[in-house]
Amino acid sequence: MLNSVIKRSALCRFKFTCLQVSECRPAQIEISKRLYSAKASGNGEYDLCVIGGGPGGYVAAIRGAQLGLKTICVEKRGTLGGTCLNVGCIPSKALLNNSHIYHTVKHDTKRRGIDVSGVSVNLSQMMKAKDDSVKSLTSGIEYLFKKNKVEYAKGTGSFIDPQTLSVKGIDGAADQTIKAKNFIIATGSEVKPFPGVTIDEKKIVSSTGALSLSEVPKKMTVLGGGIIGLEMGSVWSRLGAEVTVVEFLPAVGGPMDADISKALSRIISKQGIKFKTSTKLLSAKVNGDSVEVEIENMKNNKRETYQTDVLLVAIGRVPYTEGLGLDKLGISMDKSNRVIMDSEYRTNIPHIRVIGDATLGPMLAHKAEDEGIAAVEYIAKGQGHVNYNCIPAVMYTHPEVAWVGITEQKAKESGIKYRIGTFPFSANSRAKTNMDADGLVKVIVDAETDRLLGVHMIGPMAGELIGEATLALEYGASAEDVARVCHAHPTLSEATKEAMMAAWCGKSIHF
Ligand SMILES: Cc1cc2nc3c(=O)[nH]c(=O)nc-3n(C[C@H](O)[C@H](O)[C@H](O)COP(=O)(O)OP(=O)(O)OC[C@H]3O[C@@H](n4cnc5c(N)ncnc54)[C@H](O)[C@@H]3O)c2cc1C
Ligand SMILES: NC(=O)c1ccc[n+]([C@@H]2O[C@H](COP(=O)([O-])OP(=O)(O)OC[C@H]3O[C@@H](n4cnc5c(N)ncnc54)[C@H](O)[C@@H]3O)[C@@H](O)[C@H]2O)c1
């Protein structure tokens, strides 16, 4: 315990030297020098031009203006917020939430002592509620731009030369030419196509079409058992569709820990979604009112052809930089078309930086936002912070899946000596009283130091619970550190505490 306390206070001091303003004077002198050199010199010239108004771009623009940079943000969609707010995180979560409420009220009230009848879906109202949430959040960003004095150019940006961007106006906005001392490319990503399959957004849809279907399909096939496939598959399954997920790999859930993926398949299968893993799509074509799908099981080479009402293609996303003129400037990209950057988000043309889905790393909105803040802090102050070992991920199925840090497989591959602690939600009192106790928390710690390496969970509100684990990992905490923190009772967060106890001393209290 004493060791742990000493270790903890040493860590705190280390963090505070970086974070407490009063102790950062030398850095601040450097900051003002940098800010001066980042400032624009003439009229019509900007300190910062951000291309793309998604979570990466709009956050970078707001923070840039807050740090005193004359900032303009160029967006071609017509609304701010990018993929996330318009056709990603926000509309999907609105549908996930309301479809979950519908499903619970329809199928999970009797055992709770509530009698309901006549429950039905009003899909157009559910879509309207989703659209209203999107609208209020996207227009909120316009308000934040005004409040922070960020200029907003509605149009498509394309580099003329490394200092100049031409903007082709949309929605009646005039064309313009922007000169800036610094640029940030935040142009995001687009759907990865499946060769030979044409997305029409009606019968063969991407996530965008799957967010706006006008009726509940009887049968839906989802190609790809990753985050989009399982989130959107859950929405339509809860609303009544027969959903089959076709996944190339032997397991669903993409990069998540194998134990959690197993639990996820078990729980989601019970909800009625069918999985065809180790299976590849051979062809898909629209045939009248349905889609004819041909698949092959790669374990036994068995082929199957069947009709489905809707096919959702969700096999990943690829960076989007079309029409930006990056080739002309000679900006380096990797094999997957991600714009290459250094640790300060600079491309090989240093005053042009890149963040978010357009560059390396996980394609997540919070990662894009944090990079946006760090990139402008590098411009204005010469220092920024994103800890890539500590970016949480959440899958908003029910129950939710959330993780941060490394998986057990990764620990094995890296040759790290580790210990595991687990705790099931079925032994957590709040989960029991909520009658929603499927899932577990799994903690991976360094066997020698007890320091956290990864935390993985599937369970109720896992997306909220992962915040504590993320903070602990960021500050280099040990499992003992978290286990000794007082957690309120009865809360779901006690499951995290108990998994930490199991990892630290081999035993939890309630399991
Ligand atoms: C269905 C779905 C659900 C998702 N759910 C989540 C979630 O729950 N949590 C999460 O963390 N992530 C989620 N994501 C991922 C998340 O949306 C992205 O990681 C995030 O939007 C990336 O932000 P970004 O700013 O890099 O790019 P984007 O949000 O894609 O924004 C880029 C913007 O740049 C604009 N643009 C492109 N080229 C130009 C140009 N030449 N000129 C002007 N403008 C241009 C585009 O119009 C776009 O608005 C989801 C994605 C999808 C598809
Ligand atoms: N909650 C969230 O944070 C959230 C929600 C949605 C999307 N996103 C982000 O959007 C991005 C795209 O999501 P996604 O679900 O499309 O991608 P993904 O990478 O999460 O999953 C794609 C899945 O498709 C499978 N696959 C690939 N090719 C295939 C093929 N030919 N046949 C069958 N299966 C195939 C992969 O093995 C993988 O399981 C992700 O990077 C994700 O981070 C995040």
UniProtKB/Swiss-Prot annotation:
Superkingdom field: Eukaryota
Chief location: mitochondrion
One Gene Ontology molecular-function label: dihydrolipoyl dehydrogenase (NADH) activity
Alphabetic keyword roster: Disulfide bond, FAD, Flavoprotein, Mitochondrion, NAD, Oxidoreductase, Redox-active center, Transit peptide
Subcellular compartments: Mitochondrion matrix
Cofactor note: Binds 1 FAD per subunit.
GO CC terms: glycine cleavage complex; mitochondrial matrix; mitochondrion; oxoglutarate dehydrogenase complex; pyruvate dehydrogenase complex
Positions contributing to NAD(+) binding: 224-231, 247, 281, 316
Active site, renumbered: 489
Cofactors demanded by this protein: FAD
EC assignment: 1.8.1.4
An individual GO BP term: pyruvate decarboxylation to acetyl-CoA
Residues binding FAD, per UniProt: 75-84, 93, 157, 187-189, 357, 363-366
SUPFAM superfamilies xrefs: FAD/NAD(P)-binding domain (SSF51905), FAD/NAD-linked reductases, dimerisation (C-terminal) domain (SSF55424)
Family named by the database record: Belongs to the class-I pyridine nucleotide-disulfide oxidoreductase family.
Further details from the record: The active site is a redox-active disulfide bond.
Function: Lipoamide dehydrogenase is a component of the alpha-ketoacid dehydrogenase complexes. Malfunction of this protein blocks the progression of cell cycle from G1 to S phase.
Protein name: Dihydrolipoyl dehydrogenase, mitochondrial
